[in-house]
């Protein structure tokens, strides 16, 4: 399982899984787009590069999702395919390629307002990583 949606009053929450950080960031992007737009009608029209960094994995994933929200809001862009490289060192850096296209208003399931820090967390487990994300709608 890559991700699952969780009942959450007045927000959308999802739990994301990855055997490594690359997979966690890729699956977080797929969960984000699946939550808010019907991607079945979107073709792969272009590739968008996204980079972000932070002092730890949680902050970097939070910033990653905010970059996706920015593209969603400003360019009406949704990805169907995602590739991410995550580097750990002096902080954490994520560099990704999003492949997808524009969506129309009819394709939007619900409009996201903000990625919240409420209950936001990333945990390392014996199977990899788990992240819990709440998005204000």
Curated annotation (Swiss-Prot):
From the record, give the transmembrane residue ranges: none
**What are the protein's UniProt keywords?**
Calcium, Metal-binding, tRNA processing
Enumerate the Gene Ontology biological process terms.
Answer: tRNA splicing, via endonucleolytic cleavage and ligation
Bridged cysteine pairs (disulfide): none
Q: Does the keyword Nucleus apply?
A: no
A single GO molecular-function term is: calcium ion binding
From what superkingdom does this record's organism come?
Archaea
Q: Which residues bind Ca(2+)?
A: 11, 136-137
By sequence similarity, the record places it as follows: Belongs to the archease family.
PANTHER family attached here? ARCHEASE, PROTEIN ARCHEASE
Q: What does this protein do?
A: Activates the tRNA-splicing ligase complex by facilitating the enzymatic turnover of catalytic subunit RtcB. Acts by promoting the guanylylation of RtcB, a key intermediate step in tRNA ligation. Can also alter the NTP specificity of RtcB such that ATP, dGTP or ITP is used efficiently.
What's the protein called, per UniProt? Protein archease
Source organism per entry reads Archaeoglobus fulgidus (strain ATCC 49558 / DSM 4304 / JCM 9628 / NBRC 100126 / VC-16)
